[in-house]
């Protein structure tokens, strides 16, 4: 009888998991527990550009967030700064896109996704988003990501995702963006 009750309770609880709840369990970065070990900062200086900036991790109102600031310059064939991680891994099969909770100014900004098939540094899939001064959520469906850098398949294959980056890209501008959460939905 006790075993039946336990099995019934487990069955009821399993049925209570909604698709939204399952999606919430997908890979999610909240920038806690040593985020500097999972995130790297890059500029176009690796290829001769002159953009500059920094990535810091800050706490405000009980939430840790990443803060990327700097200046993007297209001089000397440059034009980007970015923060990148490979810690999210590939999304689960049912994932449909990338979700961010962010704020900032001087957008647009971009999510750059690299896959197991992006071999050259200038190859990635890109989707843009705008920012506001207040914390807000943006959802970027996988089909919004476009191949950049040549020699890539036209559509992003989500299960081949190897890294995710937030990038300030392609135009001269000051950068100020904060990310509180990033993951798949």
Language-model-derived ranges and their functions:
Residues 1-7:
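Bacterial N-terminal signal peptides that target proteins for export
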Residues 19-185:
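Beta-rich carbohydrate-recognition modules and glycan-binding surfaces
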Residues 8-16:
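Bacterial N-terminal signal peptides
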């Amino acid at each position: 009888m006790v075993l039946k009750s336990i099995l019934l309770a487990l069955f009821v609880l399993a049925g209570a998991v909604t698709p939204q709840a399952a999606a919430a369990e997908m890979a999610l970065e909240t920038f806690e527990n040593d985020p500097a070990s999972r995130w790297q900062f890059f500029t176009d200086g690796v290829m001769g550009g002159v953009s500059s900036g920094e990535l810091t991790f800050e706490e405000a109102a009980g939430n840790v967030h990443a803060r990327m600031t700097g200046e993007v310059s297209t001089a000397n064939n440059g034009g980007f700064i970015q923060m990148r991680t490979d810690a999210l891994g590939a999304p689960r099969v049912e994932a449909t896109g990338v979700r961010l909770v962010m704020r900032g100014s001087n957008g647009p900004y971009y999510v750059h996704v690299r896959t197991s098939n992006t071999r050259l540094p200038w190859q990635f899939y890109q989707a843009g988003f705008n920012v506001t001064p207040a914390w807000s959520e943006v959802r970027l469906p996988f089909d919004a990501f476009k191949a950049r850098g040549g020699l890539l398949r036209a559509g992003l294959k989500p299960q081949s995702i190897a890294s995710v980056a937030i990038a300030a890209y392609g135009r001269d501008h000051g950068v100020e963006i904060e990310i509180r959460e990033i993951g798949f939905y």
